[in-house]
Amino acid sequence: SDVYKRQPYGRIMSYVYREEEKTMLSAEEQLHTIASGAAQIVPESALLEKLKRGTPLNIKLGVDPTAPDIHLGHAVPLRKLRQFQDLGHGVTLIIGDGTALIGDPSGRNTTRPQLTSEQIKANAQTYVDQAFKILDPEKTALRYNSEWLLSLNMEDLLKLASNFTVARILERDDFHKRYTNSQPISLHEFLYPLMQAYDSVVIKADVELGGTDQLFNLLAGRELMEKMGMEPQVCLTLPLLEGTDGVQKMSKSYGNYIGLTDEPADMFGKVMSIPDELMVKYYRLASALPVDQIDEIERGLAADELHPNKVKRALAKNIVAAYYDEAAAQAAEEQFDLVFKQHAVPDDIPEFAADLTPNDDGTVYLAKLLADASLAASAGEARRLIDGGGVKVNGEALPAKSYNVDPALLAGATLQVGKRKFVKLV
């Protein structure tokens, strides 16, 4: 820990995934790395036995391209896949273009709207492009489950369905709640865990990853493999990652997300805004740092040997460097210091051609303008930001309820939302 005191920007800040010679770790050492950040491994003893064989395992992650953009919360299982790749194992990333026609009901109290094939295809391509910012494409088998799911005939489907009972499916927490509350459950939703389980059979998965809300589906895969005379997969679940507010899970709808396509300065600033108590969790779930170094950081923080601000800067630089490069991470830190320490307006703020035509009452609806300028996700979020004092015009915070303003105030103005977002109106 003395090294970190003397060189806080040493290896904890500059580490980026790189190809290097690695000695083969023992099964126990691999398990320690794999278990870092995991919520559950079911059963852990079976995973250890698989690792002891010394042959590469087939690690499965299935994703439904129901939304195109990925944030750090979505990337948690991708990071774990990358960990497996670095340990020498094989990865199969399944794009659920077949299951996306249903939509995963996990954690929902209503039926998901079904997407068209065109929407799914477009979302899938965007997802894959972002996923390969994390995964090594050369070590990833990319499969689309429409390959096998859409070729199932009625006989195949009936045989598959015969392996599960309605009572078993209703054990799922979300289905159970909807059933007891007399909320509708569409019959096609019952098929989702069966189809996800069948994916594991087709690719012969050794381990399947998923969120904690996916455990039922993962166990269904294990159960189906056993019934078909195969060695069952191990189920590894990962916790939900809290967003920048430190309370709600990371989500665009909560406005607390850090997107993989965010600009480096935005990404850096958002990471710096997370509560200190979430730093180690972000290191384990969202960073590219090796587990032994994260263990050392956790010990240093607990012993009060490391300054939280330096550790958080290391985290922010590590995350930015993982998605861009070290130069971008360094520039993002300098931009952060300029804006936060000197309260300056950045030199390179984007411009936005605003329509300042007044409404009938002679004002401009600022909430919509903020959304149009990508300073807020929606007019509703913009109103909440205004009410919270988070919107400034030419450096002056607007009072609450200032949704409609004089267009003269906005002509050529610099709009600021929070501490990181700026736009020059032209």
Sequence positions of predicted segments:
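Conserved nucleotide- and phosphate/pyrophosphate-binding catalytic cores
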Residues: 225-426
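Beta-lactamase-like hydrolase cores
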Residues: 23-51
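Well-ordered mid-protein domain cores that form the structural environment of catalytic cofactors
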Residues: 82-135
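Short, positively charged and aromatic/hydrophobic N-terminal segments
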Residues: 9-17
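Short acidic, glycine/serine/threonine-rich loops at helix termini
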Residues: 103-107, 152-158, 246-250
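Divalent-metal (Mg2+/Mn2+/Ca2+)-assisted nucleotide/phosphate chemistry catalytic cores
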Residues: 38, 114-238
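Short, small-residue-biased leader/transition segments that mark boundaries at the very start
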Residues: 1-4
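N-terminal catalytic cores of NTP/NDP-binding nucleotidyl/phosphoryl-transfer enzymes
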Residues: 41-105, 207-215, 221
